Every structure is written in C-alpha cells, then in structure tokens.
From Swiss-Prot:
Record-linked PANTHER family: TRYPTOPHAN SYNTHASE ALPHA CHAIN, CHLOROPLASTIC, TRYPTOPHAN SYNTHASE, ALPHA CHAIN
Residue positions of the active site: E52 (proton acceptor), D63 (proton acceptor)
InterPro entries for the chain: Aldolase_TIM, RibuloseP-bd_barrel, Trp_synthase_alpha_AS, Trp_synthase_suA
Enzyme class: lyase
Organism name: Streptococcus pneumoniae serotype 4 (strain ATCC BAA-334 / TIGR4)
Pfam family, one: Trp_syntA
Name recorded for this polypeptide: Tryptophan synthase alpha chain
UniProt xrefs under Gene3D superfamilies: Aldolase class I
Length: 258
C-alpha cells in the first residue's frame, strides 16, 4: 500500500496542479520551537502541498549561507532533535511534513527511536542529504513498516542507469537537485538541465520535485513544466526571518496549473 506522502502528492499531480513544498528551519523563530506550529499553520493556510522541516546541524554541508545561518539561529534558541520531536508530537496539521536532517543528529538520537517517536505525528517523509544510497540500509529497515518515506536525492549529473538505481522502490517523491553545489545558488543551472529533468521524470513512477536554487516566478514556471513541482528553501527562510511578505509568491506556486 502506498505511503501517505505518495498518495497525497500523486493526487495533486492527478489534478493537474504543480506540487509546492516550502522548506523551513525548525526553531528559526523568535519563539524558537514554540513558533513552529505557527509557521506550519501559516503555510498550511496558503495551501502548500507538504512542508520540509529542517533539523539544525553545526556542519550542514549541503546548505547555502541563508539556511546555514538559520540553523545557527535555531541552535542559539536551544533547538535539539529531542525537543523538536516532542514539539512535533503536539502539532496537528493535515499537511504532510518531511524532515530534512543530516545523518549525525539522526545517529545520535538513534534511528529506530527517531522513527518510533515520530510514528504518531504528521511526519510522512525523511530526507538525509549526506547518506549515500549504498548506506540507505542504515535507515530503510526501520521505515519499512511505517508511513514515513525515505526521499532519494538525485543529482542531474547522474547517468540514467544510476538514476534508475537511486529511485527504485522509492516512496513519497524524487528530489531532483537542480544545481551543482549548495542550496540557494539560484541561476547556476547547466545548459541541458531541462532535458535531464524530463528524462528523470520519464523513468520515475512517483512525483519528481526540483529543488536547490529555485527562487523566482520564472523558476516556478520552468521547473513545473519539466517536473511535477518545486521545493523552495532559501527564499522562504529568508522572508520568514526578515518579516518580508512571501504570501503572493506561495499563492502563485500553489495555484500553478499544468
């Protein structure tokens, strides 16, 4: 039976709409983790498809400066993985949450305990950017009988056969990495990016979402045309932190029709 995240995103895709997933850093709020529910409900009210929730880490190798600084602010507020898990247990939302964490915080907490403790929460997906596919067995057995999907990240520099290997049996969605480098580096796209996205889309049997560097209306239109939707991180994190209006951008992303 498909996992909830797969079903919800497939339903949006079947309705001919673009999937939109904003990223937020847990604890990057003037109230720390006490403000997490407020941010989630703000995004839920705007109609987002799912929400990616980051766990702060002191050595975030895939994060650009905006998200790295958000993580440092969160850590300064005292955010810990344990405290986040306890907070997530109290949050009620109809929107699936996807945890984005490096492997070290997960390892320190204990993978089995982490998965068990999130069983009755809105968390339906898990992204671990520094976990190689060959080591997915460190995590996958603990997810097998749960409603949490392990989301594969696929670089578009990867050959088609390797792409097929990375996405085989995947649930939730495929995270297509649009740029070479860290998050937030908008516009640094390879010339044949659209072709590679279309190729990945053809071999995937679950939604393909494009992330890393997506930040403009033009990006939304471009990537919705060749994939099933987009993930936007740095632009959202910066706007929330600085109190900038972001509602119109999100509404445009949510309303995108295929």
């Amino acid at each position: 039976m498909p996992k909830t995240l797969t079903e919800k995103l497939n339903a949006i895709k079947a309705a001919g709409k673009g999937i939109f997933v904003p990223y937020i850093m847990a604890g990057d709020h003037e109230k720390g983790l006490d403000g997490l529910a407020e941010t989630i409900h703000f995004l839920e009210d705007l109609g987002v498809s799912a929400i990616e929730v980051g766990i702060p880490f002191s050595d975030p190798v895939a994060d650009g400066p905006v998200i790295e600084e958000a993580g440092l602010r969160s850590l300064a507020h005292g955010t810990s993985t344990q405290a986040l898990v306890e907070t997530l247990k109290t949050i009620e939302t109809e929107i699936p949450l996807v945890i984005m964490t490096y492997f070290n915080p997960l390892f320190q907490y204990g993978v089995e305990n982490f998965v068990k403790d999130l069983a009755d929460t809105a968390v339906k997906g898990l992204i671990i950017p520094d976990l190689p596919h060959e080591h997915a067995n460190f995590v996958e057995p603990f997810l097998a009988n749960t409603d949490i999907a392990l989301i594969p990240l696929v670089s578009l520099t990867t050959g088609i056969e390797r792409q097929k290997e990375l996405i085989e049996g995947a649930e939730g969605f495929i995270y297509a990495v649009a740029i070479n480098g860290v998050t937030g580096k908008s516009g640094n796209y390879r010339a044949d990016l659209d072709k590679h996205l279309a190729q990945l889309h053809q071999v995937a049997d679950i939604p393909v979402l494009t992330g890393f560097g997506v930040s403009s209306q033009a990006d939304l239109e471009r990537f919705n045309a060749v994939s099933d939707g987009v993930i936007v991180g740095s632009k959202i994190v910066k706007a929330l932190h600085q109190g900038e209006p972001i509602q119109d951008f999100i509404r445009q992303a949510v309303a995108y029709q295929k």
